[in-house]
């Protein structure tokens, strides 16, 4: 039996109703497309920046490691023994001409870490011993024997420790101490204070000791140098040391420069025949130039001491350089009494000791010889195992240091 298939006349009504996922109103407009594209672009840029940041961080780490290695290399170069040289001329930012201690000049490379502003003519520099490259700039006073005396290094000599010399004490205090402590007094009067003081006289009369007392009593910086220290082996070193002394004094003003035995470099000029004599004369000319270049507003005073004032160059002695000249003669009777009193103040003298006997003797003796007499008397008492100094001890000391018996020289006849 055949069955006939009956078709549904309305199949569309039997199908489930379907709706599109987005309606026409849900389709993004052109403005939203632009914002979406911009968001994607910014996201890509952010990812690129993050990649760049990681790259920069890695590069920074590498550069820091290289910087540390370069610093260690520079320290290694500067830590090895360096050759001391003198900067002469800058060619460009990377090269210069320097002079070595052997007298030769070199065209060298400058280390990139060196501060170019410190490279001035005559500056002391450190050179690599293999390549002679300029690897360090030394302080101005690094290779100089000139230095300031600190408060603990200053002599403990006071004015009371110097017997006699009352006039000399007053004059040096007026010329050196007073202008540094009460400069306004000279302004009110309308005069310029002395620039320099010359102490001259026989040996042992207290010139150096008085300068020590000035260093003790003043708060100014004190620079002490002996004239023979300026005479160096190589040409130009002496004048450079003179410049260093005055530069150091100006940097630490108020300051006092004491040059002992100045006759070693300040003798009268003559027609020099040797290089050494010409170098000494160049030192003198540099000294004259530095003293002429003094500004009165800079509180720097110069004290010079010598035993031979008659041999000094007249240009140094003229007013304007050494304005005050203080003579230290051999002590007279009153001065000898004061020196004996100072020297024996701490000594254990016997009641029989009469110092006036030694003061009244006509022998011309210096203050240093009086000190030696007292020292010898004390040594003689120690030799005899005594705690009291007797007159015979002083007599022994006097004969030892002053009176020489003629029989001592019969051997040479």
Swiss-Prot record:
Recorded GO MF terms: ATP binding; ATP hydrolysis activity; proteasome-activating activity
GO terms classed as biological process: proteasome-mediated ubiquitin-dependent protein catabolic process
Keywords: ATP-binding, Coiled coil, Cytoplasm, Nucleotide-binding, Nucleus, Proteasome
Coiled coil regions in record: 32-80
Keyword Metal-binding annotated: no
Gene3D superfamilies noted in UniProt: 1.10.8.60, Nucleic acid-binding proteins, P-loop containing nucleotide triphosphate hydrolases
Alphabetical list of CDD domains matching this protein: RecA-like_PAN_like (cd19502)
Binding residues annotated for ATP, in chain numbering: 201-208
Positions of the UniProt region annotated as Disordered: 1-30
GO cellular component: cytoplasm; nucleus; proteasome regulatory particle, base subcomplex
Superkingdom of this protein's organism: Eukaryota
Location relative to the cell: Cytoplasm; Nucleus
Classification via InterPro entries: 26S_Proteasome_ATPase, AAA+_ATPase, AAA_lid_3, ATPase_AAA_core, ATPase_AAA_CS, NA-bd_OB-fold, P-loop_NTPase, Prot_ATP_ID_OB_2nd
Family according to the record: Belongs to the AAA ATPase family.
Function description: The 26S proteasome is involved in the ATP-dependent degradation of ubiquitinated proteins. The regulatory (or ATPase) complex confers ATP dependency and substrate specificity to the 26S complex.
Protein's recorded name: 26S proteasome regulatory subunit 6B homolog
